[in-house]
């Protein structure tokens, strides 16, 4: 049972994105699959049941729950994805990292085979007819609908295929094979985006981690020269179709964010403390909708309930405004004390109506 629940109904989400005075701040509380092996399941379910604003569709399951994990999040079971990258993880539910890069030897590029975007999402098979039917079903229910590129669609995918250091050196050296690889990745991504648009989704989400704890994973100059043009090509059909564009990156992206959002990004999803709450507020408040990722490194795992409450309020006061432009999301992972989990759920519920 993996829970990723948003408290935002369709109209409230649209009002928040468009700065049209939403009735409340949309809140999403995501519980990572690993949590169900880490915490007492009933204790976690009790917290969910006690917070219906965050979990409006909650139905208590029988325990112990039968758990299933994504193919690249299974402990000690290496997984080879459709690009030939081999993933490994040490904990069930935690997405692993790529340990084997199919083009560690670039001399093999001529024989390297790409997955077919008509059949693959990159991390597994896709049935586009079933996708269209599911989008239609959700629309009929009045729900917001999404088309999600796989996480790490371009730069991270290049690093997974080639290896991080080799990828950066290849870009610096303008290696023709790697430039061609990026072009093929862009075409693969565009094929999937076109399927999202054919299905008439409301929001296209384009997630890729570009930041480290301090600074970006790629220099701003290399990003502007090689990655940004591909981003712009992927955004163009979405903009033309009038769809909402949601961009995500973890890490410190302050030196990249102007280039990331240039050209019509409607929502930027970034992390609070690593970028600085004050900086985020100065940069985006009242201008671009922020889907703010609440701290998972410092305050929620190691702070007090009072500090958690104060942090959520500070984020809302600094980044939000009465007109909207703010959503908040938290990802729960093993290690956060249950009293802090409760404190965060309480704060997200309490302050959602801060401007009303």
Feature locations, PLM:
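Secondary-structure transition motif
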Residues: 27, 53-58, 80-85
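A contiguous, low-structure linker/loop signature
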Residues: 70-120, 140-144
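Active-site loop segments of alpha/beta catalytic cores
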Residues: 1-41, 80, 89, 114-356
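Segments that shape or occlude catalytic/ligand-binding pockets
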Residues: 34-72
């Amino acid at each position: 049972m993996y829970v990723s629940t948003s408290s935002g109904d369709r109209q409230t989400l649209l009002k928040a994105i468009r700065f049209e005075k939403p009735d409340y701040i949309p809140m999403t509380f995501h519980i990572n699959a690993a949590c169900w092996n880490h915490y007492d399941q009933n204790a976690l379910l009790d917290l969910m049941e006690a917070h219906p604003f965050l979990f409006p569709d909650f139905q208590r399951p029988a325990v112990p729950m039968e758990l299933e994990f994504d193919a690249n999040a299974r402990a000690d079971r290496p997984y080879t994805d459709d690009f030939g990258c081999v993933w490994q993880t040490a904990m069930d539910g935690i997405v692993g990292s790529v340990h084997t890069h199919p083009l560690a030897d670039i001399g093999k590029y001529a024989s390297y085979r790409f997955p077919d975007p008509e059949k693959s999402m990159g991390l597994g098979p896709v049935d586009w007819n079933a996708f269209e039917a599911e989008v239609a079903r959700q629309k009929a229910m009045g729900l917001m609908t999404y088309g999600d590129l796989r996480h790490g669609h371009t730069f991270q995918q290049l690093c997974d295929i080639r290896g991080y250091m080799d990828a950066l050196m290849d870009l610096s050296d303008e290696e023709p094979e790697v430039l061609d690889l990026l072009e093929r990745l862009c075409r693969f991504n565009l094929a999937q985006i076109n399927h999202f648009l054919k299905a008439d989704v409301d929001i296209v989400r384009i997630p890729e981690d570009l930041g480290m704890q301090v600074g970006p994973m790629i220099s701003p100059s290399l990003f502007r020269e090689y990655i940004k043009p591909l981003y712009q090509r992927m955004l163009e059909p979405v903009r033309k179709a009038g769809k909402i564009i949601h961009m995500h990156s973890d890490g410190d992206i302050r030196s990249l964010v102007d280039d990331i959002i240039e050209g019509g990004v409607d929502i930027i999803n970034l992390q609070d403390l690593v970028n600085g709450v004050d900086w985020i507020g100065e940069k985006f408040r009242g201008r671009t909708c922020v889907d703010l990722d609440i701290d998972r490194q410092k305050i929620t795992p190691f702070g007090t309930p009072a500090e958690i409450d104060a942090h959520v309020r500070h984020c809302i006061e600094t980044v939000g405004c009465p007109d909207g432009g703010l959503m908040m999301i938290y990802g729960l992972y093993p290690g956060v004390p249950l009293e802090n989990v409760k404190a965060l759920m309480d704060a997200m519920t309490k302050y959602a109506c801060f401007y009303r």
